[in-house]
Amino acid sequence: MHDKILILDFGSQVTQLIARRVREANVYSEIHPYDVDASFIRDFAPKGVILSGGPSSVTETDTPRVPQAVFELGVPVLGICYGMQAMAEQLGGKVDIGHLREFGYAEVRARNHTSLLEGIKDFTTPEGHGMLKVWMSHGDKVLEMPPGFALMASTESCPIAAMADEKRHFYGLQWHPEVTHTVQGRAMLERFVLQICGARADWEMGNYIDEAVAKIREQVGNEHVILGLSGGVDSSVAAALLHRAIGDQLTCVFVDHGLLRLNEAEQVMATFADHLGVKVIHVDASEVFLRKLAGVTDPEAKRKIIGAEFVEVFQAEAGRLTDAKWLAQGTIYPDVIESAGKGKKGAQTIKSHHNVGGLPETLNLKLLEPLRELFKDEVRELGVKLGLPPAMVYRHPFPGPGLGVRILGEVKRDFADLLRRADAIFIETLRTFIDKETGKSWYDLTSQAFAVFLPVKSVGVMGDGRTYEYVVALRAVQTLDFMTAHWAHLPHELLGHVSNRIINEVRGINRVVYDISGKPPATIEWE
């Protein structure tokens, strides 16, 4: 059994980053809503508890509070932003609405010698004060610390920026150690988890494979499992893990909706059927999907049609596998968190997980989610350890509706063919162009890159003739979390090379443009 850190979510947009940072220290962590009951907290038996930030104000009476059981467990507690304010208010301190709000970069002076911040600093002032570069995002602030607490850090506008009760191992930070802008944030969280909580650093993907395989075998027994294989990272890793556990008891259904990347169907079949020996049923449903999409231009309508048709095709194939008792899905931990948090007071409003839908009930199958405890980076690491090609495991995200939302307006087979080839040229070029400074390919230096088909024509000149052909836009972004993103400053030489190749090799396109919009205001995908 792994040591665990319990993270209570008060609605922060970056709560998932806390769990990721803890797991990066090789300690298992889980996120749960702030209002879980006392018996759950006791049964969870955490080595420590972290209270997340959130958008509410503890100065109001009906806003979230920390379960009293947290303070009675006898384990270390770390409150972050709202979590610190709630801790202060509930333990006898005072919190007030701040007249000077702090949003963004701040320099914090560490005070006193506390076990959480001892020896952690970014620079020292001429007066000899240790300083930290941190990220703040708060309006309210603690005016008076509860009994037993000592000042741990301060800023000019926030005299109590951090506090500590060393006897009970309760700590509060007004800044966010989980975001990369807080330079020493990782060191602070590792100090709390490993030294103060004393958690064992034994959460590793190598160990996870053995544990997951044993758990799947115990859960499934001799029964058969079906999995919808999309070719994406999550379903691919789920298939590899399940095959490792139950072999021929697994059958994958790969639905080709005609909106995949160039040669993607062949690559999926080669990897799973030929290389790994997984049983895969390949369904070419492209004609059906394209027929249903004819005349449809609204992006949301296209998504719904593709989603509904996928369910119908998958259901028809799965219905033929009469001995199957389980439906496996590539649900990962962020999907679980988002679905659980939906509708919770104080929580951010996020989509519910689209994978699950109503398929298990419709097919009268039991649901199997072997990756539901893992974050995306952990899923990728697991995939490599299971023998999947790194090029597949580490490739950029691809939307479920595929090229259907990268063809603006109506989806046509000709448009999909043009876009497929243009996109392949762009990706191939990103892989081959190496940045001299880092030694990495531009594909590895970007978080997501793709081509978009624009349903407009422009005048061009090729040879001695006039052309009137379509336009393709290129999009490449860099991001840590996909919540915000910067457009990638690709070398002009690379962009020129891509443009020349697309115009010369993809008949029907005579103009290539590059999208230099960030997120926000633009989204990463165009539709």
From Swiss-Prot:
Domain annotation GMPS ATP-PPase: ranges: 203-395
Q: Name one GO molecular function term.
A: ATP binding
Q: Which reaction does it catalyse?
A: XMP + L-glutamine + ATP + H2O = GMP + L-glutamate + AMP + diphosphate + 2 H(+)
For this entry, the protein name equals GMP synthase [glutamine-hydrolyzing]
For the Glutamine amidotransferase type-1 domain, which residue ranges apply? Answer: 4-202
Pathway where it operates: Purine metabolism; GMP biosynthesis; GMP from XMP (L-Gln route): step 1/1
UniProt binding sites for ATP = S230, G231, G232, V233, D234, S235, S236
What's the stated role of this polypeptide? Catalyzes the synthesis of GMP from XMP.
| Catalytic residues as annotated in Swiss-Prot or TrEMBL | C81, H176, E178
Pfam families assigned: GATase, GMP_synt_C, NAD_synthase
Q: How does it assemble?
A: Homodimer.
The answer to whether UniProt assigns keyword Membrane to this entry is no
Q: Name one GO cellular component term.
A: cytosol
Whether Ligase counts among this entry's keywords is: yes
Q: What is its EC number?
A: 6.3.5.2
Q: Which UniProt keywords apply?
A: ATP-binding, Glutamine amidotransferase, GMP biosynthesis, Ligase, Nucleotide-binding, Purine biosynthesis
Q: Which InterPro entries match?
A: Class_I_gatase-like (IPR029062), GATASE (IPR017926), GMP_synth_C (IPR001674), GMP_synth_GATase (IPR004739), GMP_synthase (IPR022955), GMPS_ATP_PPase_dom (IPR025777), NAD/GMP_synthase (IPR022310), Rossmann-like_a/b/a_fold (IPR014729)
